[in-house]
């Protein structure tokens, strides 16, 4: 028996996505910039895919830019706003691609305000309102935290920006929110939104960037006039079609999948909180049902991870993008966890493919692991 509970790192491509990618490699292999029939066939296929992905977030297809990943998109948005004397607002618990880009912006003369969170990763909206200034040009806040599942109040953040009279643009990293929470960029006032296909059972190496109509970003990759002049390079046609297929599959079932994920997370939550000493970093309420972060202060997370891996249970000690780093989680540190709680943390993350049997097996294996490792 195996239990894959590391879906926040990546997801298994669905059968329909695999079939779409494989068939398109042989059937729609043209360059979308070519004017002959082979190129036009590829361009038509990408145009249809663009419309499908746009509809999944309430956007127009002309507002979708394809790239290689959400990390690329995050870099592009932030670096496009860098100006000497500008002011950005972000949170202290962002993904490394945002965090490092903000550090780069600071070295380039931008002042960055990093909002603190409470013990469970929640923002203080009053602190956010007080941080807005006349020269604030960009606010960057993730929709769902990739380590804890904490959900940021994007609608309230947008309202606060508008009520203040600020001209700041709102960027949202929606990697852990796409196809997991309902997204309507129009209603939420989002100006830029980033996501990756491989987090929603699509292929790796393809991402999307929503750019609100009328806005423009600097290109990180210079060359041709691809993607409305905002991202040069020949398009990954098969990857894009696979991405669209994953959106087509998941979009009608967001609420159903959400409710099922909640029940699975509840089983994990109730089972693990029976273990003496376990600290829960992701409450059942007000967090994504797809992510559960816990801490076992009496052991090290990587020891538990390796033990579970031997048993066929796949979990992580935090962000996949930081798994090779020796530094403690900046997210859990910002939330005020102790060193033992941080070093003993593990993340369990679900998907619509997660089965009841996987949850039952993972719970059994984890309880066995805690009992065994506590004696070591």
Q: What are these regions, as identified by a protein language model?
A:
Residues 1-376:
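Pyridoxal 5′-phosphate
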């Amino acid at each position: 028996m195996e239990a894959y509970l590391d879906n926040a790192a990546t997801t298994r491509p669905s059968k329909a996505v695999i079939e779409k990618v494989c068939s398109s490699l042989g059937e729609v292999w043209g360059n979308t910039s070519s004017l002959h029939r082979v190129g036009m066939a590829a361009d038509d296929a990408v145009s249809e895919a663009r419309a499908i992905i746009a509809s999944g977030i309430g956007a127009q297809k002309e507002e979708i830019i394809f790239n290689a990943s959400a990390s690329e998109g995050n870099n592009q948005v932030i670096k496009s706003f860098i100006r000497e004397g500008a002011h950005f607002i972000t949170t202290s618990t962002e993904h490394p691609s945002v965090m490092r880009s903000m550090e780069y912006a600071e070295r380039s003369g931008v002042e960055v305000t990093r909002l603190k969170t409470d013990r469970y990763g929640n923002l203080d909206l009053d602190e956010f309102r007080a941080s807005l200034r006349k020269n604030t040009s960009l606010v960057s806040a993730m929709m769902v935290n990739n380590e804890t599942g904490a959900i940021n109040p994007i609608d309230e953040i947008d309202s606060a920006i508008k009520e203040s009279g600020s001209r700041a643009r709102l960027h949202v990293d929606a990697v852990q929110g796409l196809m997991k929470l309902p997204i309507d960029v129009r209603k939420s006032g989002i100006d830029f939104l980033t996501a990756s296909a491989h987090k929603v059972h699509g292929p790796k190496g393809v991402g999307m960037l929503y750019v609100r109509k009328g806005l423009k970003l600097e290109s990180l990759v210079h060359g041709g006039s691809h993607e409305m002049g905002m991202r040069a390079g020949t398009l990954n046609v098969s990857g894009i079609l696979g991405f669209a297929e994953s959106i087509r599959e998941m979009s009608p079932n967001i609420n159903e999948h959400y409710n099922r994920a909640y029940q699975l997370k509840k089983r994990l939550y109730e089972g693990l909180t029976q273990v003496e000493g376990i600290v829960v970093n992701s409450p059942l309420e007000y967090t994504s049902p797809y992510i559960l972060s816990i801490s076992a202060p009496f052991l090290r997370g990587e020891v538990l991870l390796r033990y579970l891996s031997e048993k066929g249970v796949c979990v992580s000690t935090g962000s996949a993008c930081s798994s090779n780093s020796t530094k403690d989680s900046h997210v859990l540190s910002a939330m005020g966890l102790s060193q033992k709680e941080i070093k003993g943390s593990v993340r369990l993350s679900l998907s619509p493919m997660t089965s009841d049997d996987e949850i039952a097996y993972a719970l059994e294996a984890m309880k066995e692991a805690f009992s065994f490792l506590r004696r070591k």
